[in-house]
Design a protein with these regions (language model features):
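Phosphate-ester processing/binding pockets and catalytic centers
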Residues: 1-219
């Protein structure tokens, strides 16, 4: 960060939009911009991080559930949190680790909601109907308790929160455009969960692209 005199967290949306703490990028020539983005990716590649997410297409979610549940639909974040934590926990089990869940701090209300979701996983297991989720092999409450080590909120300036933010956008875009360059780079460099598990396990253990029924994924 010192080389570029960066004095703010590495937030993906600000970097891509060249706004707020990264507005100076707009004043640099193309070669300088490309050098910055390449060095940023080198950082992402070098750290011992594996990308995994739950990505929900909002139009697809509304199309699938609005008529059936109207305003009683679950918050998207409950679905995303539960699935992402469970899949990370399953991988942690495979490699013999326990899992720390370290969400980025937001505000008191939303922070409390996430902590509640975490507690529900350890008390009750996954919140989905058994008949529709059985084939995913959901973890039991006991398995969650054995695998989840702690829940701790992190500030936006936390290195782990910044890395999670940088990884999230390419993983999201990969659901819509398989050839998205940052997504392809992470994939080719073995930085995604799919690179560490057999292809037949992707449906249950890889990044979950949920409610993508209406999405025509570009190659």
């Amino acid at each position: 960060q010192a080389k570029w005199d960066i004095r703010c967290p590495l937030h993906s949306s600000e970097i891509r939009g060249q706004t707020d703490g990264f507005h100076w990028l707009a004043d640099r020539d193309k070669a300088d911009q490309e050098r910055f983005y390449e060095q940023l990716y080198v950082l992402m590649r070098a750290v011992p991080v594996i990308g995994l997410a739950c990505v929900i297409d909002r139009p697809g979610y509304n199309h699938r559930y609005k008529e059936r549940y109207a305003n009683e639909r679950w918050s998207l974040c409950k679905t995303a949190f539960s699935i992402a934590v469970e899949r990370a926990a399953k991988y942690a089990q495979q490699v013999g680790y326990r899992l720390r869940v370290l969400p980025e701090r937001c505000n008191k209300l939303e922070d409390s909601v996430l902590k509640t979701y975490y507690g529900e996983l350890t008390a009750n297991g996954m919140p989905f109907a058994v008949d529709t989720s059985e084939h995913y092999g959901p973890l039991s409450p006991e398995e969650f308790r054995k695998t989840l080590y702690e829940f701790k909120l992190k500030s936006k300036s936390s290195p782990m929160a910044q890395l999670a933010d940088l990884y999230l956008w390419p993983i999201c875009m990969g659901g819509y455009h398989a050839g998205n360059r940052p997504y392809e780079q992470l994939k080719s460099d073995g930085k995604l969960i799919e690179c560490l598990i057999p292809e037949q396990a992707w449906e249950n253990l890889g990044t979950k692209y949920s409610c993508f029924d209406l999405v025509q994924r570009n190659p």
